[in-house]
Amino acid sequence: MYIAMNRFKVLKGSETDFENLWKNRDSKLHEMKGFRTFHLLRGPVNETEGYTLYASHTVWESEDDFIAWTKSQNFRDSHKNAGTGKVLTAGHPRFEGFSAIEGA
């Protein structure tokens, strides 16, 4: 099992727009081999720096399945409008990938 996460620093006041963007997107994940599940996670608010932390969380059967997704036409189609609208985040997302330890 492989878990892929992107962490986003969403500017305070932009949380609803950010969540709606994800809710209304045309996701192609379910069409991909090895895809198991997706969750958008809301984390803590950082009052000092003015953002709310979010993470997109996907679970895949393998890292190879995730990599195939990132190289697919479905990935390109799903991300074709990224960065074209109102600025909702402080900087680019931060990717983190994890392989599950079998038997742990």
What are these model-derived regions, one by one?
Residues 3-8:
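Active-site-flanking beta-strand signature of metal-NTP-handling nucleotidyl enzymes
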Residues 9, 41, 57-59:
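Short hydrophobic/aromatic beta-strand micro-patches
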Residues 10-18:
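Short, surface-exposed ligand-recognition loops at beta-strand->loop->(often short) alpha-helix junctions
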Residues 27-36, 51, 59-96:
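An amphipathic, aromatic/His-enriched active-site/gating alpha helix that lines ligand/cofactor pockets
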Residues 41, 96-98:
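Solvent-exposed beta-strand sheet faces enriched in polar/charged residues
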Residues 44-49:
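Acidic pyrophosphate-coordinating catalytic loop
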Residues 98-104:
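Short, low-order "capping/linker" segments at domain edges
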